[in-house]
Amino acid sequence: MQRIASIHRQTAETDVHIHLNLDGHGQYNVKTGIGFFDHMLDQLFRHSLIDCDVTVKGDLHIDPHHTIEDCALALGQAVQQALGDKAGITRFSHAYAPMDEALSRVAIDISGRPYLVWHSAFTQPRLGDLDTEMLEHWFLSFAQGAGLTLHVETLYGRNNHHIAESLFKALALALRQAVAIDAGKQGRIPSTKGSL
């Protein structure tokens, strides 16, 4: 079974195209018009081994908010679509990712219940052309689009770039494990209620 999805999300604010393969090799092509954001998505795809093409044309003349939010929603929807009925997936996972002095942890449940618990903070308002407050919003929007419960925490760190990168790498590693097929589940949906 191929776990591939394509999403096209178009509004008056953005035009988002996503094509992904959950069972890829970490190949990606990301073009959002926001350099630092592209760098974070590069980390996500490389370390999750998800193949993904992302193209976003957004109203950057206003600010990056809509571009980041709509990209996260569409990417989440693509993950959810590619997972199908979620039969046989591992479902739960967590991962730590260090980036020099920064260490972050992400725990994930592919539950169908979108929720974000966020414990990370930044000491500067921008990283390149990205408002740091948008990082929490990206994780929330991604969780909503994908139907994930995410617990995201930076345990420590000083450099804001390193903190952000450790967050996306931790998500990548946790997502890679959670979407993996567990042969021991013999194709069953990993829930006592029979659906996710």
Curated annotation (Swiss-Prot):
Q: What is its EC number?
A: 4.2.1.19
UniProt keyword annotations, A-Z: Amino-acid biosynthesis, Cytoplasm, Histidine biosynthesis, Lyase
InterPro entries attached here? IGPD_sf, ImidazoleglycerolP_deHydtase, ImidazoleglycerP_deHydtase_CS, Ribosomal_Su5_D2-typ_SF
- What GO molecular function terms would the record report? imidazoleglycerol-phosphate dehydratase activity
Superkingdom as given in the UniProt entry: Bacteria
| Reactions listed under catalytic activity | D-erythro-1-(imidazol-4-yl)glycerol 3-phosphate = 3-(imidazol-4-yl)-2-oxopropyl phosphate + H2O
One GO cellular component term: cytoplasm
Question: Quick check: keyword Amino-acid biosynthesis in the entry?
Answer: yes
Give any Pfam family that matches.
Answer: IGPD
Localization annotation:
Cytoplasm
Q: What is its main location?
A: cytoplasm
Q: Name one GO biological process term.
A: L-histidine biosynthetic process
Task: Cite the annotated pathway.
Answer: Amino-acid biosynthesis; L-histidine biosynthesis; L-histidine from 5-phospho-alpha-D-ribose 1-diphosphate: step 6/9
Q: Which family does it belong to?
A: Belongs to the imidazoleglycerol-phosphate dehydratase family.
Q: What is this protein called?
A: Imidazoleglycerol-phosphate dehydratase
Per the UniProt entry, what species is this protein from, by scientific name? Zymomonas mobilis subsp. mobilis (strain ATCC 31821 / ZM4 / CP4)
Gene that encodes it: hisB
